[in-house]
Amino acid sequence: MRIHVLSDLHQEFGEVDVPTVECDCVVLAGDVSTKHHGLKWIRRRFPAVPVIYICGNHEFYGEKLPKLTKRLREEAEGTNVHFLEDGFLTIGGIHFFACTLWTDLALHGDWFTGVVEAGTTMNDYKRIRISTQGYRHLAPRDTRRLHMASLEAMRQFFASHDPAHSVIVSHHAPSMRSLPENRRSEPISCAYASHLDGFIEQHQPQLWVHGHIHHSSDYRIGRTRVLTNPRGYPEEPNRSFVPNLVVSVDADAAHRSELSRPLRKTVRKNVRP
């Protein structure tokens, strides 16, 4: 299966020209644009190929997190765009699990310090609201809770799907190794990545695609390939961004013929509020 991998297009700052490539599906690992505008662009740009789309942190800016999640799911329903949040989808024998995967803020071992650092530094906690009934802003305790919920949903996914034929899509990074080396020791890096190396080694999905960090990376944790292809901000573009990047994943020979069949969809509805 050929997957067109993109993230962090940040079209709130202007539309990005993405080329048409030959692929079996497109993965957009968050921060396409703010609010619901990214979904509208995706439907125009990729009308004829299955698309797996998740929210990054920027989609939620100016929004209530649960409300936008519900809206995007409803607007994507019945289209070729599969908006997932702690949900999964099977295409051609490859199982995709996707979520924003907020970090646990414990990258350096001390989650309390991470909570303080992220809470005072990250715009996420100033520009995103969490309550559907009131106006409370998102707080670090919320993103830690959401991280734990996503990790538990992923464990349940691995319990019923072959990891060797699975692809994980997240916005936030699963390992410090995705960060540039000169950024790894910074206290705020806990808001960009979690230390899930052991989790990955335990389950060994074939591929893990993420975004959020505007720095391209491609490495392995055990048998798992970890990959990101972010465009970044227009004033600070990622010069290693490859707009036509296509990566291949392998399915069982028995599943290869499914690529020409209608999509088999097994989406688990969002387990979050």
Where do the language-model regions lie?
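Beta-strand-turn-beta hairpins that frame and shape the catalytic cleft
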Residues: M1-H4, F88-A98, H165, R220-R225
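N-terminal active-site segment of His-dependent metallophosphoesterases
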Residues: M1-I54, E59-L68, P140
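Active-site neighborhood of phospho(di)ester-bond hydrolases with catalytic His/Asp-centered motifs
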Residues: V5-S7, V26-D31, I52-N57, H82-D86, ...
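Active-site environment of divalent metal-dependent phosphoester hydrolases
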Residues: H10-V16, S33-H37, H58-L68, F88-T90, ...
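Glycine-rich phosphate-binding loop signature in dinucleotide/nucleotide-binding domains
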Residues: T20-V21, I91, F157-A164, Q204
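A basic- and aromatic-enriched beta-loop-alpha substructure that forms the phosphate/nucleotide-
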Residues: I52-E59, K64-Y125
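Binuclear metal-dependent phosphoesterase catalytic core
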Residues: T79, P180, E186-Q206, I213-P273
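Active-site-proximal loop/helix segment associated with metal-binding centers of metalloenzymes
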Residues: F97-V167, P174-R183
